[in-house]
């Protein structure tokens, strides 16, 4: 399973992004990755940053537009973010 932290830098994300976030919490998590990739491609101006754990990225060959980080840094990222959706 790909573990992605979807960081919303804005307190009021767009409806489209909210819908994608809702879908990402559903049972088809691989599909949610594709939806998020598409959202970033179509709306590059949205305040979105997606992080993938390095070990998951290596195992699954995650697309290069995702930024991978070490697991140890994940807690700091969560604590410093306005809101985080995890799936």
For each feature predicted by the language model, list its residue ranges:
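Active-site regions of enzymes building and remodeling cell-envelope glycoconjugates
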Residues: 46-58, 63-72
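Structural motif
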Residues: 7-11, 36-38, 87
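Short, flexible loop segments at the rims of nucleotide/cofactor-binding pockets, characterized by
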Residues: 8-11, 32, 61-65
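Extreme N-terminal starter segment of soluble prokaryotic enzymes
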Residues: 1-5
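Histidine-anchored nucleotide/phosphate-binding helix
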Residues: 11-36
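Short, charged/polar "capping" segments at the starts of alpha-helices
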Residues: 13-16, 39-44, 59-60
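C-terminal structural segments of small proteins and small subunits
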Residues: 64-87
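Short internal beta-strands
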Residues: 30-38, 43, 49-56
